[in-house]
Curated annotation (Swiss-Prot):
This is UPF0102 protein gll3754. It comes from the Bacteria. Belongs to the UPF0102 family. GO terms for molecular function: nucleic acid binding. InterPro entries: Restrct_endonuc-II-like (IPR011335), tRNA_endonuc-like_dom_sf (IPR011856), UPF0102_YraN-like (IPR003509). Pfam families: UPF0102.
Length: 126
């Protein structure tokens, strides 16, 4: 596993632990299907959150992080979320949200949360 991949995995674990510490229940990590992959599925309060974790080693973020997940990636996440819900019918009536966690390296080489964008995009995939 190369350094970038290792950091991305470390970032996903860190975000899952961070959300769990806030009372979230992590239902799935790196859930894969024919439509793609969902980094994290977390029940946070009464909301089912599909979380995309974006990790960058430096300060290579746009000003608000909005460019981290483009329209193509949004459509893939929407398809993957629909397939996740089909595979878990007990969750099908959940209120769902698509969140993006922007993660960077701290000066010591560890993980730091740059931004957590709850409701980063709507279910339309635009």
């Amino acid at each position: 596993m190369d350094r970038r991949h290792r950091f991305a995995l470390q970032a996903e674990i860190w975000v899952a632990d961070h959300l769990a510490a806030q009372g979230g229940l992590v239902l799935a990590r790196r859930w894969r299907c024919r439509g793609g992959e969902i980094d994290l599925v977390v029940r946070l309060g009464g909301v089912l959150c599909f979380v995309e974790v974006k990790a960058r080693g430096g300060n290579s973020w746009d000003s608000a992080g909005w460019e981290a997940v483009g329209a193509v990636k949004q459509r893939r996440l929407l398809l993957a979320a629909a397939l996740f819900l089909a595979a878990h019918p007990e969750l099908a009536r959940s209120v769902c949200r698509f969140d993006v966690a922007l993660v960077g390296r701290d000066p010591g080489g560890g993980v730091r949360l740059v931004a957590y964008i709850a409701g980063a995009f709507e279910g339309s995939g635009r």
